C-alpha cells in the first residue's frame, strides 16, 4: 500500500467492477493495510496484545481518503470496511462524512462480549454480560455521530446468531430468533444478515475433528495434540463458537441435502433441515422467515425507525435490552427480553396509548399507566409511541 503503483492498480480493479455495475465493496481487514516499516522492537512479555503494532498504521486514512477521491466518490456505490478490534474512538474516523473515506465500518464488539464476558446474574440464564452489550452499542452509536453505523450478530466467521445470542433449544428457537430479528431491524444503522439466520438456522455442533473444514479449527486441534492439550474440551468449545457452524449448506428444503445440491456437499447438512428450511417456512405465516419479512417491510415503511436517534432505556436491567428511536415524525420503543426467564421492564412512561407494531408472541403484554410490564422468555415488542 505504500507503493503508488500498487494503489493505482487497485483503483483500476475497482473501476473495472464498478463500470460493470457492481453496487459496492466490502473491504476486508481494512485497518491492517498500513504498516510501520521502521519495525519497532516490542517486548511481548510486557505487551501481550500486539494489535496496536500491526493495525491503524501510518497513512492508513490517507490511503482510504485517496481511494475515495480517486474511485468511490465518482460512482453511485457503497463501501463497508471490516474493522475487527477497532475501538469506537478509532472507528468513527473511517466513516465520518467529512473525512470522505468509507460509508460504513463493522466491528466485532458483540462477538467479543459474547466470548469474553460473564453473566451479570447467572439467574437470568444469559451466559454473557447483557449490560456490557448495551454499553458497547451505546458507545459506538455516540462515537459514530453523523456517520452511519452497522448492526449484525453473525457472519461467516461467527457461530449462528440464534445459537449464540438466543437459544436453539426447540422450545425457544423460533421465539429467540424473532426477538433477535427485531433487535437487528429496529436499531440505528444498516443491518447485516448471514444467509440462513432469517430462517433461524442453528449451530450444527460437530463431534469429531474430521467433520470440520475450517483451517483455524484444524490447526488449533493439531497444536493441542502436539502439546498434550485437552482436545475433547476444545471440540466441546467448537460446538459453540466454531466458524463451521455458520458454513453448513443453506437449508432450502427438507430433502437429503436440503435442496442445496444433488451431490454430497463439503460439510454435513444440519439434521434439523427437515424442520428449519425455506420451503416450509414460506408456507407458515408464523415462521421465523415470514416474521423477518414483516419486520423488513415495517422498517422500510417507517423512516424514523431507520434514521431516528438511539437512546437506551432501563440501561441497568440485566435481562432486557430496551431503547428509544426518536425521529422527526414518530418515536418508537423496542423492548427485548434476551433471557430464557421471565423479566420485568419499567418503561418509565405510560404505554397504554402506545401501539404495538411488532411482537413475537400471539399477543403483547398488558401495559399499565405506570409501573413495570412483565415479559415472557425471549419476548420482543416494538411500540409506536403516542
Predicted segments with their positions:
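Active-site and adjacent substrate-binding regions of carbohydrate-active enzymes
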Residues: 1-386
Amino acid at each position: 500500500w505504500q507503493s503508488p503503483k500498487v494503489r493505482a492498480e487497485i483503483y483500476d480493479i475497482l473501476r473495472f467492477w464498478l463500470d460493470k455495475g457492481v453496487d459496492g465493496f466490502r473491504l476486508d481487514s481494512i485497518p491492517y493495510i498500513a504498516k510501520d516499516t521502521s519495525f519497532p522492537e516490542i517486548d511481548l512479555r510486557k505487551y501481550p496484545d500486539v494489535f496496536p503494532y500491526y493495525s491503524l498504521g501510518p497513512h492508513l486514512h490517507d490511503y482510504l481518503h485517496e481511494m475515495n477521491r480517486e474511485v468511490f466518490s465518482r460512482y453511485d456505490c457503497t463501501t463497508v470496511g471490516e474493522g475487527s478490534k477497532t475501538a469506537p474512538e478509532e472507528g468513527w474516523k473511517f466513516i465520518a462524512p467529512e473525512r470522505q473515506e468509507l460509508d460504513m465500518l463493522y466491528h466485532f464488539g458483540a462477538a467479543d462480549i459474547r466470548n469474553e464476558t460473564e453473566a451479570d446474574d447467572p439467574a437470568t440464564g444469559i451466559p454473557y454480560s447483557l449490560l456490557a452489550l448495551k454499553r458497547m452499542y451505546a458507545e459506538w452509536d455516540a462515537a459514530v455521530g453523523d456517520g452511519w453505523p452497522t448492526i449484525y450478530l453473525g457472519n461467516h466467521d461467527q457461530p449462528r446468531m440464534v445459537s449464540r445470542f438466543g437459544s436453539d433449544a426447540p422450545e425457544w428457537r423460533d421465539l429467540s430468533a424473532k426477538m433477535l430479528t427485531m433487535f437487528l431491524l429496529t436499531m440505528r444503522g444498516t443491518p447485516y444478515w448471514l444467509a440462513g439466520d432469517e430462517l433461524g438456522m442453528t449451530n450444527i455442533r460437530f463431534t469429531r475433528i474430521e467433520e470440520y473444514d475450517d483451517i483455524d479449527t484444524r490447526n488449533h486441534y493439531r497444536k493441542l495434540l502436539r502439546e498434550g492439550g485437552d482436545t475433547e474440551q476444545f471440540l466441546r468449545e467448537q460446538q459453540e463458537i466454531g466458524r463451521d457452524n455458520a458454513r453448513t449448506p443453506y437449508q432450502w428444503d427438507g430433502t437429503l441435502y436440503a435442496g442445496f445440491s444433488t451431490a454430497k456437499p463439503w460439510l454435513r447438512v444440519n439434521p434439523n433441515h427437515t424442520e428449519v428450511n425455506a420451503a416450509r417456512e414460506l408456507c407458515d405465516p408464523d415462521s421465523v422467515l415470514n416474521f423477518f419479512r414483516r419486520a423488513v417491510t415495517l422498517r422500510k415503511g417507517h423512516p424514523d425507525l431507520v434514521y431516528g436517534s438511539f437512546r437506551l432505556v432501563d440501561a441497568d436491567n440485566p435481562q432486557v435490552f430496551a431503547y428509544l428511536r426518536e425521529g422527526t415524525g414518530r418515536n418508537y420503543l423496542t423492548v427485548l427480553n434476551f433471557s430464557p426467564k421471565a423479566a420485568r421492564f419499567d418503561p418509565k412512561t405510560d404505554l397504554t396509548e402506545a401501539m404495538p407494531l411488532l411482537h413475537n408472541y400471539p399477543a403483547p403484554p398488558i401495559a399499565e399507566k405506570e409501573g413495570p410490564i412483565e415479559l415472557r422468555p425471549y419476548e420482543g415488542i416494538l411500540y409506536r409511541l403516542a
